[in-house]
Every structure is written in structure tokens, then in C-alpha cells.
């Protein structure tokens, strides 16, 4: 069942690094504010934990918007879904909720961004890829970003022995099983057993997407490095130096990769990996003008 987010006492158990964060509760979207005011509103040391009430569904009338540190031009909307990790049922629920929201609240320009990590850990990585290939929400521009798990899988399937070992220890065994590849299959035979269209999908993934003042990436960026000069390793795998930074990145970075019990909203970034595939939920952020709402499955 889809529900609005509420803070949990601890992060879901998962072999992935977690982080905690809080946001201030707002009752409705507000006009864009100057950056100093936004920073003050979102100062995590000065505001209480946000605990919205439970609801039965995430339809258009139930979206609960809060002030966002970023903005989109009027008439534009972006849906961004965090790390999926093989959770096909939850992804289908969010896509259905997005389709319903779009039907009830049309907008001039709508983009759906998936932030990567479609595979590993969860029960149906192959099903997730097939679902994404089928363009699950009609009428939207869809951007599929690469995650570190896709990068590792591609390297492993290309014959990188170290990557193959890493992959097997970080959920790759569940992905292989979803392709009906037995654990004792020689590694050199994996690639030939992966559906051709699935491999093409993995190879087609983008590293980033820009919209308004937002930069959508899988993991984050390297502080102190110009956005145009960021490297793939950081975009797919950075953690602490990015998460701990309070500097202005030149864009509000929307990312996954580091799991937390609920979305993390900071003056310079918004994290929406909430532990899907590892006991947590799958989160979708909805961006409009200078506001953001969250729905989960």
C-alpha cells in the first residue's frame, strides 16, 4: 500500500551505508524565497523532526508539499524515484500513483527520473528492468540514471573478475537468479545468458540530469569540483565527503545511494534512498516550483 512517509526510529538493516535526516513541516507550497531564507528554514540543527500523518494512498489530493531548497520553472514537474533494488511491486505502485497524479493534475512539462540501482538485493531485478524498458508511465519524458550496482554489473558481465566478486557480495547473486543464471555457472558465461534488451538498457543509462536548479545523480558530487568536471566514480559512489558538506554545489543535488529511514532535505541536497530491497520503502519525490512532496510504497 502506498503511504506518506513517517520517520522510523532507525534505518532499515541493509549492507549499505545509511544516513539520517530531518525536514521542516510545511502545509502547502510557497513562493520561491531567497537562498538565505531557505537555508534558515532547512537548518537541520534548528528544526523539529517532520512527522506527517499516515494516509491510505498517495493520490494527487494527498500530496503534502514542503519547502524545497531548489526550484523548477512554473508549469514543470519532476518525479524522481530513489534506489529500487529489485522491488518491482513497489515500483509499479509508485508508477500507478504517478499516472493518477498526472491525470488529475496535468502540467505543461513532466519528467520522470529514476536515480539508479535498479538491481540487486530485492526479489525481481529482471522484472524491474523489463518494466522500465516498457516505459511504464505514458506521456512522460523518462530519464534512467546509472547506479553503482549497474556499473559493477556491467563490469562483471564484461569479464572483470574483481567486479564479479564484488557484485556477488553486494546482491548480484539475486540479480543473476532473476535471469535464471545458476550460482555455479562459470562467470565467463554470464553475459550470454542475460537478455539482450536488458544488457542494452544497462548500457544506455545516463550519469546525470539537470532541471531547473536541480542536479539529479545517483550518489552525489565531489565538493570543490565544478559540476562539469565531476567524474563517474564520484557520481556513482561518493558518500561521506558529499553528505557532510554544507557548501553551495551550484545546484541542489537530488540523489540516492545512501539509505535513510526517510527523505533527507538539506540546503544543498535531497536524498531519497529509503532502503528499498533491504527492509525499507521505495520513495518518489515530486518537485514543483519551489516545493517538494514525497510518496512511498
What are these regions (language model features)?
Residues 81-82, 113-116, 143-148, 252-258, ...:
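Active-site neighborhood of phospho(di)ester-bond hydrolases with catalytic His/Asp-centered motifs
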Residues 56-67, 93-97, 126, 196, ...:
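Short, motif-level signal for alpha-helix interfacial/capping segments enriched in acidic residues
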Residues 75, 107-109, 139-141, 212, ...:
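A general structural motif
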Residues 85-86, 120, 151, 221, ...:
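Short, glycine/acidic-enriched loop or turn micro-motifs at the edges of active sites
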Residues 66-74, 103-105, 133-136, 207-210, ...:
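A short acidic-Thr-Gly-centered motif at the start of a beta-strand
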Residues 2-6, 10-93:
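Short glycine- and acidic-rich boundary segments immediately preceding or forming the N-terminal edge
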Residues 87-165:
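Core catalytic region of metal-dependent phosphoesterases/phosphodiesterases
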Residues 166-271, 275-281, 287-297:
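Acidic, His/Gly-enriched loop-helix segments that form or flank divalent-metal centers
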